[in-house]
């Protein structure tokens, strides 16, 4: 079994499975760590349109607090919507949602993030249609940005049981609105990256609109995962404020110049200044300042001679 095979591995695994609780059948994700099932999370939003008919078999996740189920390890296992908290790293708190949960108007991940989850894992079986990969990509990156979280999206691929549907295995790792890694469609590969949960926690403290952790209470399941040194696969740019060559740098720089020039244009127009005086030292900063002054005058429809450049001693 999965638990027996992973007992010695310090790896968190999220696996999909059907679970019977009471008289109902649920579409669920089990969180497994070192051979033990930490908890089972049922799917909240069940699609029943187009090619989907999940309500034929399953019922949505029950409202209210977590319950418990038996038969998935020793004793009772938590069942419901919950958080999983790393004891050694307070900023690493994760939660799970399933497929359609992300596509719903109010995703469970929003409540999880408000309650403290910095990483969301999503088990998905998103069918492949023309252009859908772009929409999925926008959903995942957008949700990670809105929630200031890391988002792991694992999609069904080749080998998935199917009739008239096709699954491409398009999987992604996003962080705070940026795509860190993704697999190509119909490729037998994995998406691997690192998520900076401490940076995410800092961003949430900085944003005054991000809610406090006690907005909605969830059962929190602790687990012990001591930090270990690993090889960094995530690229760290030397120029953190400028995109790398060939990935929108020209557009970014043009946008910077446009913002600064329009800001200066407003001040010149508001104060009624007849000229703009800029000191030129020979460095990059003063060169940019001169370009901004020239562009501002162009926006005002005034000649460049209204910019007075004064050379300064080195």
Predicted region positions:
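PAZ/PAZ-like end-binding module
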Residues: 287
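Enzyme catalytic cores with a strong preference for nitrogen-chemistry domains
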Residues: 1-279, 290-304
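Conserved G/P- and acidic residue-centered "switch" motifs that form tight phosphate/ATP-binding loops
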Residues: 283
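Short beta-alpha connecting loops at secondary-structure transitions
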Residues: 307-312
């Amino acid at each position: 079994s999965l638990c027996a095979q992973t007992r010695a591995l310090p790896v968190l695994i999220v696996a999909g499975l059907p679970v019977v609780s009471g008289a109902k059948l649920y579409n669920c994700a089990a969180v497994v760590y070192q051979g033990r099932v930490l908890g089972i999370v049922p799917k909240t939003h069940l699609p029943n349109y187009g090619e989907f008919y999940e309500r034929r078999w399953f019922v949505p996740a029950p409202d209210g607090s977590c319950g418990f189920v038996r038969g998935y390890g020793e004793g009772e296992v938590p069942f419901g919507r919950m958080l999983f908290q790393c004891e050694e790293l307070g900023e690493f708190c994760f939660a799970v949602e399933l497929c359609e949960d992300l596509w719903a108007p109010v995703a469970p991940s929003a409540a999880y993030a408000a309650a403290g989850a910095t990483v969301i894992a999503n088990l998905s079986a998103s069918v492949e249609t023309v252009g859908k990969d772009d929409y999925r990509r926008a959903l995942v990156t957008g949700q990670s940005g809105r929630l200031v979280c890391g988002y792991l999206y694992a999609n069904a691929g080749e080998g998935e049981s199917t009739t008239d549907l096709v699954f491409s295995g398009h999987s992604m790792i996003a962080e705070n609105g940026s795509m860190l890694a993704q697999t190509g469609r119909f490729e037998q590969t994995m998406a691997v990256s690192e998520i900076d949960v401490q940076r995410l926690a800092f961003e949430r403290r900085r944003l005054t609109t991000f809610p406090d952790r006690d907005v909605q209470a969830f059962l929190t399941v602790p687990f012990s995962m001591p930090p270990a040194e690993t090889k960094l696969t995530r690229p760290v740019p030397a120029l953190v404020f400028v995109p790398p060559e060939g990935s929108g740098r020209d557009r970014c720089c043009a946008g910077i110049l446009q913002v600064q020039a329009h800001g200066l244009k407003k001040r010149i127009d508001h104060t009624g200044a007849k000229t703009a005086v800029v000191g030129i030292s020979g460095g990059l900063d003063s060169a940019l300042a001169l370009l901004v002054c020239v562009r501002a005058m162009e926006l005002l429809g005034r000649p460049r001679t209204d910019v007075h450049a004064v050379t300064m001693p080195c």
